[in-house]
Amino acid sequence: KVYGRCELAAAMKRLGLDNYRGYSLGNWVCAAKFESNFNTHATNRNTDGSTDYGILQINSRWWCNDGRTPGSRNLCNIPCSALLSSDITASVNCAKKIVSGGNGMSAWVAWRNRCKGTDVHAWIRGCRL
């Protein structure tokens, strides 16, 4: 599923991401835009053999099990396929675990490069939340 901007913002808010670990909703919507273009079915293979899955491009080396990533830790205890669902609950729950680690949202390269230090509120402007 490809979410609309405000549709995704509303879903993320409902699932408790607004100000989760101090990151406003705009940060999460911005990250999703530049990680997956709001597409829950996005997958991208990495040079180390791992794959990033779903709307927040969660990595199989650490966070989920896809059965083909050597030494996968599966710290979210989920199959990576769960991260491709049109229902973003699994992605959000895993993202909460990721952002609670030492690096915060810097765990997402796209957030670091495209969202951090910008006017992320623009990503939810005009949305009825």
UniProtKB/Swiss-Prot annotation:
GO annotation (BP), single: defense response to Gram-positive bacterium
Subcellular location: Secreted
Active site: 35, 52
Single GO MF descriptor: lysozyme activity
Disulfides per UniProt: 6-127, 30-115, 64-80, 76-94
Cited Gene3D superfamilies: 1.10.530.10
One cellular component (GO) term of this entry: extracellular region
Pfam families from the UniProt entry: Lys
EC numbers, comma separated: 3.2.1.17
Keyword tags: Antimicrobial, Bacteriolytic enzyme, Disulfide bond, Glycosidase, Hydrolase, Secreted
Keyword RNA-binding among UniProt keywords: no
Catalytic activity line of the entry: Hydrolysis of (1->4)-beta-linkages between N-acetylmuramic acid and N-acetyl-D-glucosamine residues in a peptidoglycan and between N-acetyl-D-glucosamine residues in chitodextrins
EC class: hydrolase
Additional free-text comment from the UniProt record: Lysozyme C is capable of both hydrolysis and transglycosylation; it also shows a slight esterase activity. It acts rapidly on both peptide-substituted and unsubstituted peptidoglycan, and slowly on chitin oligosaccharides.
Described purpose of this protein according to its UniProt entry: Lysozymes have primarily a bacteriolytic function; those in tissues and body fluids are associated with the monocyte-macrophage system and enhance the activity of immunoagents.
Family: Belongs to the glycosyl hydrolase 22 family.
Assembly and binders: Monomer.
Stated name of the protein: Lysozyme C
Organism annotation: Tragopan temminckii
Gene name in the database record: LYZ
